[in-house]
Amino acid sequence: ALVWRENGKHLEVLLVHRPRYDDWSIPKGKVDPCESVRTCAVREVAEETGVQVILGQPLSRVRYTIGGGARKEVHYWAARVAPGSSAAVAARAAVKPASTKEIDDVEWLRVGQARKRLTYSYDRDLLGELVDLWEDGKLDTWTLVLVRHGRAVKRSVWDRPKERDKETDEATRPLTH
């Protein structure tokens, strides 16, 4: 995932250095068995950078050849740092940080610096895609949940947790029963 943030009027992205290849790149990795590509993206960013993220806009897929002629396809998303209090983060399994043999440096860089630092042209293309979305105001995303034939539980029959306030109750009341 290409992790981004705004710092004043500037867009910054998070890059990693891999000593084995002596390159600077966007955090990425291999999908574990029975893991979705989205879950993989979130896990790999956490392992390689120590940063928990929430995925946003999908970016292009990149295909290239690795050693032995094998083909590799990488799915990318724009991603923002998740708030520490995020329910999405609380629900995630703990991750083991990447060793310093895999990732030995992580840096937030402004776009111009990142473009110069990135080793591969396909990473620079992804950065350009992210910048275009940012300039068009299309990086901020939100979740929209559609429920067909859903029915809210009546307040009178819902056994709500006692420690929550009414606003939280309404936000967490089951939609179906």
What are these regions (language model features)?
Residues 1-4, 95-97, 171-175:
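Short intrinsically disordered, low-complexity coil segments enriched in acidic
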Residues 7, 100, 137-139:
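Short, flexible hinge/linker loops that cap or flank conserved catalytic cores
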Residues 25-29, 165:
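Conserved acetyl-CoA binding element of GNAT-fold acetyltransferases
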Residues 29-125:
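Unchanged
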Residues 67-71, 155-160:
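Short aromatic-enriched loop/helix-cap "lid" or pocket-rim segments at secondary-structure transitions
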Residues 121-141:
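Charged phosphate-binding loop/patch that engages nucleotide di/tri-phosphates or the phosphate backbone
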Residues 158-177:
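Loop-to-helix element that buttresses phosphate recognition and phosphoryl-transfer chemistry
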